[in-house]
Swiss-Prot record:
Main location: secreted
Enzyme class: hydrolase
EC numbers for this chain: 3.4.21.-
Signal peptide residue numbers: 1-32
Keyword set includes Iron-sulfur: no
Protein's name according to its UniProt entry: Serine protease 1
Pfam families (UniProt xref): Pro_Al_protease, Ricin_B_lectin
Similarity comment: Belongs to the peptidase S1 family.
UniProtKB keywords: Disulfide bond, Hydrolase, Lectin, Mannose-binding, Protease, Secreted, Serine protease, Signal, Zymogen
Length: 525
């Protein structure tokens, strides 16, 4: 499927989903075009860690291949572009702070070869040149442009339903109004007090309606999960319009995965967050739908306009495009106006609530799409806005969490007599809060007690293999996963940690074929 240039009119912009797990199979991805150099650029308000450079090991071959495929560029071009994008990300907040009211936006050029910064004075242009970017002298600063765009929302005319969206375009230094007629666009501009020369009009026949797979009382299994946060996860607000207390289910098991704590659809936001249900715990990773692989998430630093952008969703899976513009006010109808970022990545029904990623940085939550795989345009809710709004913290792949692992007869995994010597077989014991029971979950998949790793003795894989404590050595026999079903699985043996002979206190731990028995069920406390 080939996407046209994003300057072409897009059709049937719509919401794209109802909640579901990120492991549900979906349709093939589609291609995306080069970006329009237009957007409002903001410094990231999140507290995420600095992203790695373009050559980061986390940018694995599968992810790079998707960028090459969807953006139709070579591998060498992709690597060069990613390096430039990282430079733009670092420059953006620094220049915005240094230039203040002289700053009028930052974006990456259409050819992906230079960083362009809008400024209002020649003196500011010299600062931009010194920083290694290309200045463009314009009339209005970014603050002024944003105020003009905001006036459209505050002074909407009676026929606002015929206005699809509006945004700031720093490349032209104007506000762009997209509507189904010039008359509707002019009415919006007039109501906002915008004068000729300060705005542009784009005419489109779009009918913007909610089209997600949602019916009253259904399981919302048609959406996608975005990012884990501490204590829960994020998804789209229109996937949880029932609000606080609504139960969300996962298509991995068909069972409950979370309970909505807060949601908002309209008044600028399309997001929801739910508390984890039962034994479910999120990891700082996003699937890219290629053989079960994924991308480690290390923060939420915002990418610059013109940067590549990839999306993970249950329907179109892993698709990539460009970040076209920021702070687009999208009118979904029925009073639902949301401020989103626009990309040329493809998204369809069921992708709502999914994750947008730039390199190893979380960017946003899938909200809407034009539902046209021949002219891909999609919109996401910036994740930092949501994290700040509800005071949430993103779970990242670099985090280490410590807890007690409880199981059969409510006993905890335990090192006998706090003897941390190599080769000590682990047991279950009455939970007592000692260091012998504190298990740390590490990003590399190891589980550690007192700095040593849980280990399958001699890397054996047969039933009855002892689970012991050993110095960490990087072998796959020391990697475990605790899934939502409560199975603690050794990755090497693909067998479950099991309490031998269904023993009580002092029962030894071994690996055994997963059976679903109570002596193989574990949870963190």
């Amino acid at each position: 499927m080939k996407c046209k240039k994003p300057s072409a009119l897009f059709s049937a912009l719509a919401l794209v989903g109802a909640l579901g797990a990120a492991s549900v199979l979906g349709a093939a991805s589609a291609n995306s075009a080069s970006p329009v150099a237009a957007a409002t650029v903001q410094a990231s308000s999140g507290s995420a860690k600095t992203s790695v450079a373009a050559t980061s090991k986390s940018q694995d071959g599968d992810v790079l291949a998707a960028i090459v495929r969807d953006l139709k560029i070579t591998k060498t071009q992709a690597k060069k572009r990613i390096k430039l994008e990282e430079k733009a990300r670092q420059l953006e907040p620094r220049l915005q702070k240094k230039l203040g009211k002289k700053f009028a936006g930052l974006w990456i050029s259409k050819n992906g070869k230079k960083i362009v910064v809008g400024v209002t004075t020649k003196k500011a242009a010299k600062v931009v040149k010194k920083a290694g970017a290309t200045p463009k002298i314009v009339k209005s600063n970014l603050t002024t442009l944003k105020k003009r765009a905001t006036k459209i929302s505050k002074n909407a005319p009676s026929d606002i339903k015929n206005v699809n969206s509006w945004w700031v375009d720093p490349a032209t230094n104007k506000v762009v109004i997209e509507a189904r007629s010039k008359k509707a666009a002019k009415a919006a501009a007039t109501a906002a007090g915008l004068t000729a020369g300060t705005y542009e009009i784009t005419v489109s026949d779009d009918v913007i309606v909610p089209v997600r797979d949602y019916w009253g009382g259904d399981a919302l299994s048609g959406c996608t999960l975005a990012f884990p946060v501490y204590g829960g996860f994020l998804t789209a607000g229109h996937c949880a319009v029932e609000g606080k207390g609504h139960i969300l289910k996962t298509e991995m098991t068909g069972g409950q995965i979370g309970t909505v704590e807060a949601s908002q659809f309209g008044d600028g936001i399309d997001a929801a967050w739910a508390k984890n249900y039962g034994d479910w715990n999120g990891r700082g990773r996003v699937t890219h739908w290629n053989g079960g692989g994924g991308v480690d998430i290390k923060g939420s630093n915002e990418a610059a306009v013109g940067a590549h952008m990839c999306k993970s969703g249950r329907t179109t899976k892993w698709t990539c495009g460009y970040l076209l513009r920021k702070d687009v006010s999208v009118n979904y109808g029925n009073g639902h106006i949301v401020t989103l970022n626009e990309t040329s990545a493809c998204a369809l029904g069921g992708d709502s609530g999914g994750a947008y990623v730039w390199n190893d940085q979380a960017q946003g939550i899938t909200s809407g799409s034009n539902m046209d795989t021949n002219n891909c345009r999609s919109f996401y809710q910036p994740v930092n806005t949501v994290l700040n709004k509800w005071k949430l913290s993103l779970v990242t792949s670099t985090d280490v969490t410590t807890s007690y692992v409880q199981g059969y007869q409510n006993n905890c995994i335990d090192v006998p007599n706090s003897d941390f010597t190599d080769g000590k077989q682990l047991q279950v014991w009455n939970c007592n809060g000692t260091n012998a029971q504190k298990v740390s979950f590490h990003p590399d998949g190891t589980l550690r007690i007192n700095g040593k790793c849980l280990d399958a003795r001699w890397a054996w894989t047969h039933n009855g293999t002892e689970v012991q404590l050993m110095n960490c050595n990087g072998h796959i026999a020391q990697k475990f996963t605790l899934n939502g079903a409560g199975d603690l699985v050794n990755v090497h043996a693909n067998k479950c940690v099991d309490v031998k002979d269904w023993g009580g206190q002092g029962g030894k731990l071994q690996l055994w074929e997963c059976s679903g028995g109570a002596n193989q069920k574990w949870w963190r406390r």
